[in-house]
Amino acid sequence: MRTTDFAKHLTSFFTEYLIGERGVSPNTIRSYSESFSLLLNFLDEQVNIKADNLRLEHITRKMVLNFLDWLQDTKKSSNATRNQRLAALRSFCTYMQYEV
């Protein structure tokens, strides 16, 4: 199985950027990991995009807004939790600005 561009960049984001360059805490790694697990779950259940088919172009503003709504409506996440998930996505997108 080939690695998608999303998987490749997400792996690099965690291993090279968050741990290597930023030196974030294990709690941040855990929180960000949970955020991306939820995103993959959302995409699989709601958008019918499997993790092994996910590409960067699938990550759009509309998709992120739908994901955030899903967190609140389906997962009953608080505003604070929703914002934590958004922060993880924002950090990844900021990282991607300099990588692509």
Mark where each language-model region is.
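Short, motif-level signal for alpha-helix interfacial/capping segments enriched in acidic residues
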Residues: 2-5, 10-14
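N-terminal core-binding DNA-recognition domain of tyrosine recombinases/integrases
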Residues: 11-27, 33, 37-100
